[in-house]
Amino acid sequence: MNEQYSALRSNVSMLGKVLGETIKDALGEHILERVETIRKLSKSSRAGNDANRQELLTTLQNLSNDELLPVARAFSQFLNLANTAEQYHSISPKGEAASNPEVIARTLRKLKNQPELSEDTIKKAVESLSLELVLTAHPTEITRRTLIHKMVEVNACLKQLDNKDIADYEHNQLMRRLRQLIAQSWHTDEIRKLRPSPVDEAKWGFAVVENSLWQGVPNYLRELNEQLEENLGYKLPVEFVPVRFTSWMGGDRDGNPNVTADITRHVLLLSRWKATDLFLKDIQVLVSELSMVEAPPELLALVGEEGAAEPYRYLMKNLRSRLMATQAWLEARLKGEELPKPEGLLTQNEELWEPLYACYQSLQACGMGIIANGDLLDTLRRVKCFGVPLVRIDIRQESTRHTEALGELTRYLGIGDYKSWSEADKQAFLIRELNSKRPLLPRNWQPSAETREVLDTCQVIAEAPQGSIAAYVISMAKTPSDVLAVHLLLKEAGIGFAMPVAPLFETLDDLNNANDVMTQLLNIDWYRGLIQGKQMVMIGYSDSAKDAGVMAASWAQYQAQDALIRTCEKAGIELTLFHGRGGSIGRGGAPAHAALLSQPPGSLKGGLRVTEQGEMIRFKYGLPEITVSSLSLYTGAILEANLLPPPEPKESWRRIMDELSVISCDVYRGYVRENKDFVPYLRSATPEQELGKLPLGSRPAKRRPTGGVESLRAIPWIFAWTQNRLMLPAWLGAGTALQKVVEDGKQSELEAMCRDWPFFSTRLGMLEMVFAKADLWLAEYYDQRLVDKALWPLGKELRNLQEEDIKVVLAIANDSHLMADLPWIAESIQLRNIYTDPLNVLQAELLHRSRQAEKEGQEPDPRVEQALMVTIAGIAAGMRNTG
C-alpha cells in the first residue's frame, strides 16, 4: 500500500518544487519563502500543533493586499497539480492500476463462480448492456479549458517520466517541458472574466469528446472484448456498442433564459459539424491504410469498374467527399446562410455505417481479418457510439412553462383558462386534442414571447434529423397532464415520430407521488399506444436533498424507483430510470459501483442513464485511459446489479428507514426552513453571496433574485457549505435520526442493515466520506471572522451535531475511524488538506476584508476580489467536488 502512495507523493512533491521555482522566478524569493512558511505551518497544524495553528491564522490575517493573490494562487495551483498527479496515479502501473486488476475480468470471474448462472445467461446480460452518459454543463467545472489542456500535458509528461529506461537527455527534456507548462499555468489567469455562453459550454463538451472519448470508447470496447474472449470464449459483435453520449449543453433551458430555440438549433448544427470533422480524420487514415486489392464479388459489384483497382480506397474516398460536402453545408448554415441541401448530405448513421461495414465484411471474407479489426473496427464503433450527431441532446424545460403556454392558448380560443382547470379536466382536454386530426394552434395567433419560445423549441425538435435529440425532460413534473401537455405541444409542431418524454420527479412530495402519476398515465390507451412499451423516468437527486435532507431524500428516491419498477413490470413496459446525480454527496454523488449496487433490485434492467456533471466529467473522462477505467467500472457494476441483484430489504428495515426519514427530515427542515437565524447564518458564514459573482456557468445561481434557501439552486447551496468545510447539506439530520433509533434499542438492527443491505451501507459510507472532508475548526474560524456574535450559538450547535453524528455513524459501521475501509481516499484527503487549509483561512480573511469595505461604503479592492475568486476555485479543487 505505502509503496503505491510513495510514487504519488514523490510526483506531488516534484510538481510542488517546480511550482516553487516558477513562483520564485516570477515574484522573487520573499514570496516563495512566505508560501513555504505557510505550508509548513499548515502541515504541523494538521499534525495537531496548536501553537503553529495559531501562527498560521496570524500569518494569513496579516498578509498585505499585495501578497493575497500570489499566496492564494500558489496553493490553488498546487491543488490542481496534486489532482493531476492523483489522476495519473489512478491509471499508472505503479499506482492504483497496479492493485486494481481489471474490473471487468474480476466481475466476469465472480459471475462465472456462481453455480446458478450459466455462461449463456452471462452472455445475454452482456448483450443487453446499455449505458447512456448525459454530459451536463454544471457551473461546477470551475477550471478554465485552457488550464485543463495544460494539465493533460502535465499528465503525459508524468507518464513518460515513469519509464525507467529513458536516457538522461530525454529526462531533462521532459523536466524542461514540465517547467514550461507549470510556468504557462502560473502566468495564465485561472478565473474566467466572462460567464461562458451555452455555446461555449457545448464546445467544452465537444472538446471532451475529441480529446478523450473518441479514443477512449474504442479502447474500452477492445478491453471488454479481450476479457470476454478470455473468460467466456465470446467475441463482441461488430455492431455491439453499449455506450452512448448525450448532452444537456445547449438543450437544458430549465431556469436558464440564455438557452433559446435558436441556441439549440445552433448547437445541433455545431455538433454535427464537429462529427464530420472527427470522422474526416478517421476516413483520411483509412484512405491511406486500405490499399488492398483483393475483394469479393459483392464489393466489386458495389464499386463498379471505376473502383475495381482499389475497391476499399474507392469507397473511403466517396465517403470522404460526402463528409466534406456535409461539412461545407453545415458551415454555411452556422454562418446563417441558407443553401440547398447537397447531394449525399449525411443525416443518418446508416449512411456512414454501410460503406464502412461493406469494407469490413469484405476484408473478413478475404482472410484479412487482422486489417479489418484495426482502425476500421474503431471507426465502425465510433459510428455506433457517436454517429452523425456526435452527441445527441436532451431538451429540458420546467413543467409550468408548458402549463402557461396552454393557458394562454385556451384563453385566446375562448374555452377557459387551462391553468385553473382540475387535473381531470386537463387530462380530458389533452387526450381529446391528442386524438384529434385537426390542428389546435390558430394560424394568426400572436402568443407572448415566453409561449413563443416554448413553441419554437418544439419546432426545432420537429425539424431536427430523427435521432439527434434523445429525450424531452420535464423538470418539476407533478401530474400526468404535465407529460401529456408536452406530447400535445410536440404534435402541434408537426413531429413525425414518438419522442421519449421523461418526467423528472425532484422534490420529496413528487418522488412520493411518482408511481401514482405513472400508473395513471399507463392506464390511458392513447398513451400506451404512443410509447410502444418503453418509458423513461428521471429521478432528481439534488433538489430532493435540498428539500428534505439527504437521508429522507435517498429513501424517497429508493422507494420511488422500487415502486416504478414494479408498476412497469406488471404493465409489460421497459423502464429506463434516468439518474440526475451530481458529483457531491448532497446531489447524489457516490462512487459508481457502490451507487449502482445500492439501487433497488431490477433498476438497471432497462440500462443505465445517468448525468455526468461539471468537474466530474474531467475526473472520470478527462483522458482516454481514465475513460476506459470509468466505463469498465460502470460495465462491471451493471452486470453485477442485473445478475446478482441486491437483496430485497426486510420489512423491519423498511420500517426503520421510514422512521429515519421522518426524523431526519424534521431535523433538517427545523433548521433550514424554520430557524429564523438560518438564512442570515448561511449568508454570513459561507461565501454564498459572493459565489453569485463567479463567472461559472451560463445559468443564473438563483431561480428568483430574492428569497431564501428554496430559491437557491441546488448547486450554489452545496457549493457554499463545501467552501466553509461544514458540508452541512450532506449530513444534516441523518446522524440525529440514527442516534434516535439507536436510543430506541435498535442498534443491532442498524448494524445488520449496514452489513447486509448495500443501500444502507452506501448511505453510511457516503456520510463517512463527507465527515472526512469536513473540518470543524475551520468552520468555527469562519464564524469567528465573519458571523455576528448573536448567531454564534447556531454555528456551535451545528458543529456539535456533526461531532455527535460522527460518533454514531462509526458505532453502527463498527469502524474505529473514518474511511477505515478506503485508506486510499483517506490518504488523498489528508494529502490535500495541507494545501486546502490555508486557502480556507485566507478565504475567511478575504470575505472579512471585502465585507468590511462594503460596510464602510468603500469600493471593493480588486486584489481582494480576485484573490477571493482564486480561493473559491482552489478549495473546489481541494474538495474534489464542488456543487
Swiss-Prot record:
Q: Which UniProt keywords apply?
A: Carbon dioxide fixation, Lyase, Magnesium
The UniProt entry, under SUPFAM superfamilies, shows: Phosphoenolpyruvate/pyruvate domain (SSF51621)
Coiled coil, from the record: none
Q: What GO terms in the biological process aspect are recorded for it?
A: carbon fixation; oxaloacetate metabolic process; tricarboxylic acid cycle
GO terms of molecular function? magnesium ion binding; phosphoenolpyruvate carboxylase activity
Provide the catalytic activity annotation: oxaloacetate + phosphate = phosphoenolpyruvate + hydrogencarbonate
* UniProt GO cellular component terms: cytosol
InterPro entries registered for this protein in UniProt: PEP_COase, PEP_COase_bac/pln-type, PEP_COase_Lys_AS, PEPCASE_His_AS, Pyrv/PenolPyrv_kinase-like_dom
What Enzyme Commission number(s) appear in the record? 4.1.1.31
Looking up HAMAP family in the UniProt record yields:
PEPcase_type1
Family per record: Belongs to the PEPCase type 1 family.
What protein am I looking at?
Phosphoenolpyruvate carboxylase
Provide the organism lineage as a comma list.
Answer: Bacteria, Pseudomonadati, Pseudomonadota, Gammaproteobacteria, Enterobacterales
The primary gene name is ppc
